[in-house]
Amino acid sequence: MKLDHLVLKNYRNYAAVDTTFSPEINVLIGANAQGKTNLLESIYVLALARSHRTNNDKELIRFGSEFARVSGQVSRQSGSHQLELIISHQGKRARIDRIEQPKLSQYLGHFNVILFAPEDLAIVKGSPAGRRRFIDMEFGQMSPKYLYNLSQYKTFLKQRNAYLKQLKYHQAKDLVYLDVLTDSLAAFGAELITARAKLLETMSDYAATIQQDITKGRESLHFSYQTQVDPSLRGDSEQVYTALGEMFAKQQAREIEQGTSLVGPQRDDVLFIVNDKDVANFGSQGQQRTTALAVKLAEIDLMKDQTGEYPVLLLDDVLSELDAARQTHLLKAIQTKVQTFLTTTSLEGIQKEIIATPAVFKVDEGTLARA
């Protein structure tokens, strides 16, 4: 999978961009606050129809403009496709090959990207909510079914929590309606837990090999999926559905008392276990960085495994955060097989013997030019 051509109109600090890219390594070089991260963000937005930096789409529109447009020509095994997002103050519109998509969910999955930014180095020791967002964003790209189940689950969770609050404050009395919401939540929750268990197991295997390679066999790594359902049941969605139903029944009185759902995958987490210890609490900073790198590289392999194609990789000033050994491993892992966009303030320190002939672009005050 490659991004061949990108067109921007009124996006952040870019009035207009129209450029083609190398199918291998593309380096965006420039001083700070010139628009390097904005350009990477636009590629991310083209893929996922949302920013990784803000939940307010209006921030993506250039100051004083009515709309922003992001358009790209993407090459896949199935052929070349034009993707387009138009972001206005009224909302977003998505097109594939000039055909309007009624739902954003029908747009997603046509272009897959993986972003690696300095803040991702903290993924192993960040919050459970951050790890859940990470899981959902990546797995949702790989599987339309996962994305659908996640969307449905969030809808029913919101409705159920609102109704639990009504029951708490005696504004509602009908427990039959609560049972209907609970059954739907258990059904979609079971699908999510089963999918997460399967995908995390595969991703863990990839990450374990990478961690061993980086550390020359000194460190073992595996993922420990933390969910309320017993591990022996997670491979069967029907058994997970039954288990969730039993837990909801047991917790119903407490849920009404607290006005919120206490059971379900919205409480999941993933622990990264290095040499039999939770690296977030007991690992060194070096181990945490190696683990974060292994997780990100495992994402690439998992996406290839699930979709049949490598994603596009976005590296936002991350090379400066890695020592020479980790930088070398990252660059060797991606060279020639993964189209990559990386930002940097200087080419100094980048492993030039690995990136022999990158396409270099100069970013300066919202303009992009081939260097």
Curated annotation (Swiss-Prot):
GO MF annotation, one: ATP binding
GO cellular component: cytoplasm
GO BP annotations listed: DNA replication; DNA synthesis involved in DNA repair; double-strand break repair; SOS response
SUPFAM superfamilies for this protein: P-loop containing nucleoside triphosphate hydrolases
Record's keyword annotation contains ATP-binding: yes
Pfam family membership, one: SMC_N
Keywords assigned: ATP-binding, Cytoplasm, DNA damage, DNA repair, DNA replication, DNA-binding, Nucleotide-binding, SOS response
PROSITE patterns documented for this protein: RECF_1 (PS00617), RECF_2 (PS00618)
Location within or outside the cell: Cytoplasm
InterPro entries: DNA-binding_RecF, DNA-binding_RecF_CS, P-loop_NTPase, RecF/RecN/SMC_N, RecF_2
NCBIfam families: recf (TIGR00611)
Protein name: DNA replication and repair protein RecF
Species per Swiss-Prot/TrEMBL record: Lacticaseibacillus casei (strain BL23) (Lactobacillus casei)
